[in-house]
Amino acid sequence: MDKLSIRDLSLEGKKVLVRVDFNVPIKDGKILDDVRIRSAMPTIHYLLKQDAAVILVSHLGRPKGGVFEEAYSLAPIVPVLEGYLGHHVPLSPDCIGEVARQAVAQLSPGRVLLLENVRFHKGEEHPDEDPSFAIELAAYADFYVNDAFGTSHRKHASVYRVPQLFPDRAAAGFLMEKELEFLGQHLLVEPKRPFTAILGGAKMSSKIGVIEALLSCVDHLVLAGGMGYTFLRAMNRQVGNSLVEESGIPLAKKVLEKAQALGVKIHLPVDAKVAKQCDSGEDWRELSIQEGIPEGLAGFDIGAQTIELFSKVIQESATIFWNGPVGVYEVPPFDQGSKAIAQCLASHSSAVTVVGGGDAAAVVALAGCTSQISHVSTGGGASLEFLEKGSLPGTEILSPAQS
């Protein structure tokens, strides 16, 4: 990695501002999935062992900005943090201002302070409108650490402006290092071959950039989910009422042509689980794509033959990247295709397997095989943008590695 690491910092007795991504799902004040909190713990534990005072900065959800909204408070994070750390973690009721400055001043080495949601201030998402916001945050600490890969594609104050105020003192945390290692080194720089990318999800248009970027480095491209039907329509297949982006058909044709020119093998569904609607998961059947899906029916998952086809491609690959479910995984039995992909990745222990995006990560968790995947990225849009562009605003701005 060509960026400064927290291993390079002299931390004893120093205050460290750590940008974490605690944007976790919360219902009725309870956290539904704490993987993002757990993922930040190696960095936090390391800083504490070095006797640093740790100031945690995060956002949660999309508050209006400019006002406190209890629904987006980081208060539910506190008991989870305390459980992992084994000691009290104070929550500053604001991330800037006198109350925050006092909380930082009282913070002792070896302890953690959590600042309230940075998005309660418009200066976080609109740093040009309030440059003083980043300056106030930066004033708290001796060092800055970014461990929020999932937010690093945004030029927000705590991700992009604050590290600029720490020349030669803005470092990557352990989670950030791991993300850059797997998405960078293992996928973009030196992937073991054959290299296969599996892209699902609803919209092709939102992923056209990463599709075109991946064409230059993969050997196989598996396309399924809603976007798969757009590609099938581009090949004049009958897909009935399946989700198709009409405006994306010309783009799909160009992708197919480019793949052929580059020698990239495209794999599309050969059969599908179809129904009139997917709400109940009832009255479905499997149909061959060759025969076509009639009007009035739509595909909501890949069929058994496609599972077999995709599994064979996975098993013959040395590197696999997966983003986006291949069916409506929230509604059984349309979850079977996505779960089969997850289980196939998990069983292929000799390969480098990387899963990016919230939905694909959720499927892997539902299938009970997260621990068997080489790396489950904490970034959805961030992981795709990194693969498309090779860097992110929040990673570019970190200090260079010490020579």
Curated annotation (Swiss-Prot):
Q: Give the GO molecular function terms.
A: ADP binding; ATP binding; phosphoglycerate kinase activity
Q: Where does substrate bind?
A: 21-23, 36, 59-62, 119, 154
Please give the pathway this protein is involved in: Carbohydrate degradation; glycolysis; pyruvate from D-glyceraldehyde 3-phosphate: step 2/5
Give binding positions for ATP.
207, 299, 330, 357-360
Q: Which reactions is this enzyme annotated as catalysing? A: (2R)-3-phosphoglycerate + ATP = (2R)-3-phospho-glyceroyl phosphate + ADP
Q: Which Gene Ontology BP terms does the record give?
A: gluconeogenesis; glycolytic process
Listed InterPro entries: Phosphoglycerate_kinase, Phosphoglycerate_kinase_CS, Phosphoglycerate_kinase_N, Phosphoglycerate_kinase_sf
Alphabetized Pfam families for the sequence: PGK
What keywords are assigned to this protein? ATP-binding, Cytoplasm, Glycolysis, Kinase, Nucleotide-binding, Transferase
The record's subcellular locations are:
Cytoplasm
Q: What is its EC number?
A: 2.7.2.3
Family, according to the entry, reads as follows: Belongs to the phosphoglycerate kinase family.
Quaternary structure per UniProt? Answer: Monomer.
* Protein name in the entry: Phosphoglycerate kinase
Q: What organism, scientifically named, is this protein from?
A: Chlamydia trachomatis serovar L2 (strain ATCC VR-902B / DSM 19102 / 434/Bu)
Gene name of the encoded protein: pgk
